[in-house]
Amino acid sequence: MRAIEIAVRDVGGFAARDVGAALMRKAFDVDNGPLTDMTAERGERQALSDLFAGTMGTYKNAQSHRKVGLDDPDEAAEILMLASHLLRIVYARRSRTAAP
């Protein structure tokens, strides 16, 4: 999940001090987030912002602040798939946010 945070910072042009769920809310702000797809319906934009922020709060934040046991290999694989999909979304935004 740290890779997602780093990618969002990089692609969105955020500072190192921008972290976690708050960073995701800024990056995917429904009205002016640099990684927000403004062609999507408002509810979908909000849902994507919630997905990114929720992922940070649920997975990255927990791992950052305490030892979280992850003993189930299926669950670990599912979390990796989620992270991979979120990275795909971020990197798809890279060309839209690049300066001409």
Give the predicted meaning of each segment:
Residues M1-T55, V68-D74, A92-P100:
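Amphipathic alpha-helical interface elements
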Residues S64-H65:
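Histidine-centered active-site/metal-ligand motif
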Residues L80-R93:
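Structured adenosyl-cofactor binding patch, chiefly the S-adenosyl-L-methionine
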